[in-house]
């Protein structure tokens, strides 16, 4: 059985294009214990939060898969929510990777209510965005 599972994982990784959401769903069916979040945070959240069909808001959603703390809730517990990502090219990947039928996707930066500028300039470096025009 382990050999069949390993072979299936190998086939998925080598023959299915890197459309993360499709590939991740297939891998998740074979390896349901796969962590998407950093250091298994998504798995711990799924264990603590027992509710089915809940609602989430993820600020800094990235591509919707990489270090996602909500994808596991969506795939295995039927959750839906709002995913917010400020970086345009990363947001484009988010739209491909996460279901718009289940979630609302928004390209926006989140700032405090007392932020007095018209826009936020952001520097993007891998998984971290840093605002540049905040005093």
Question: Residue ranges of each PLM-predicted region?
Answer:
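Phosphate/nucleotide-binding beta-alpha loop and adjacent structural elements of enzyme active sites
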Residues: 1-135
């Amino acid at each position: 059985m382990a050999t069949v599972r390993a072979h299936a994982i190998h086939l998925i990784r080598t023959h299915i294009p890197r459309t993360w959401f499709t590939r991740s769903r297939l891998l998740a069916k074979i390896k349901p214990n796969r962590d998407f979040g950093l250091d298994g945070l998504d798995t711990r959240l799924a264990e603590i939060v027992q509710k089915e069909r809940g609602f989430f808001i993820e600020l800094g959603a990235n591509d919707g898969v990489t270090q996602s703390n909500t994808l596991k809730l969506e795939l295995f517990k039927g959750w839906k929510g709002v995913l917010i990502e400020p970086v345009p090219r990363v947001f484009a990947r988010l739209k491909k990777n996460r279901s718009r039928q289940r979630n609302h996707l928004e390209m926006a930066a989140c700032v405090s209510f007392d932020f007095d500028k018209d826009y936020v300039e952001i520097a993007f470096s891998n998984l971290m965005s840093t605002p540049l025009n905040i005093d």
